[in-house]
Design a protein with these regions (language model features):
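Bacterial N-terminal signal peptides
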Residues: 8-19
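Twin-arginine (Tat) signal peptide motif
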Residues: 2-8
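Extracytoplasmic metal-acquisition and chelation regions
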Residues: 2, 25-100
Length: 100
């Protein structure tokens, strides 16, 4: 839940970054679930399109990552996720990315 308190700050930074970033820069944004993807899509309107990890009607509770998802995460400039309480499957991949 403490990550939800940080969400307004992160969204503010992303919206400010869209004004600072040159138009031709390719910002790679990834969202873990559809509600976060929707917010990121709204903020990135005209700048780019975020990728989504849990697609369709998939549930983040029992989700299994594929190698293609790991590659998307590794190439991302910004990752939106709720936290390890909801998205346990992202805990290890994000900690390994953070070490790099």
């Amino acid at each position: 839940m403490k990550n939800l308190k940080k969400l307004p700050l992160i969204l503010s930074i992303l919206s400010l970054a869209s004004f600072i970033t040159p138009v031709n820069a390719d910002v790679k944004v990834v969202a873990s679930i559809k509600p976060l993807h929707s917010l990121a899509s709204y903020l990135m309107d005209g700048v780019g399109k975020p990728d989504l990890i849990v697609e369709g009607y998939g549930s983040p509770h029992g989700f299994s990552m594929k190698p293609s998802h790991a590659k998307i995460l590794q190439n991302a400039d910004l990752i939106f996720w709720v936290g390890e309480d909801l998205e346990i499957f992202l805990e290890k991949p994000l900690s390994s990315i953070a070490k790099k």
